[in-house]
Amino acid sequence: MVTMDRTEILEKIKQAEIKVEEAIRAAEEERKNKILEAKMKAREIIESAEAEAVKVKEDILNSARQQIEAEKEEIRKRETKNIEDYAKKGKDNIMKAVEMLYNEFVGMMEHA
């Protein structure tokens, strides 16, 4: 049977306490590193999500702009045609009015 004296026992206890303290410090350091890594990863995820959100927003805006431009062009064409139709009708009406006035004038001259 091995017997240790009190000094040896105290020394072993002290060494065990030192090992425990070192293990605690190492665990604490590892915990801090893991938290830091998690924060960095979370930041990366947030930045990636924000970048994706910006891209989606730009895509939506570009699509809306294209649609608006297409609608504007369609309206522009339709209204240009309407204006041309009104102009043609106006010219036709002017010719009819001139012809009517001419006929009235000729009729008045014949009776004069």
Curated annotation (Swiss-Prot):
Gene3D superfamilies: 1.20.5.2950. It comes from the Archaea. This is Uncharacterized protein AF_1158. It comes from Archaeoglobus fulgidus (strain ATCC 49558 / DSM 4304 / JCM 9628 / NBRC 100126 / VC-16). The lineage of its organism: Archaea, Methanobacteriati, Methanobacteriota, Archaeoglobi, Archaeoglobales.
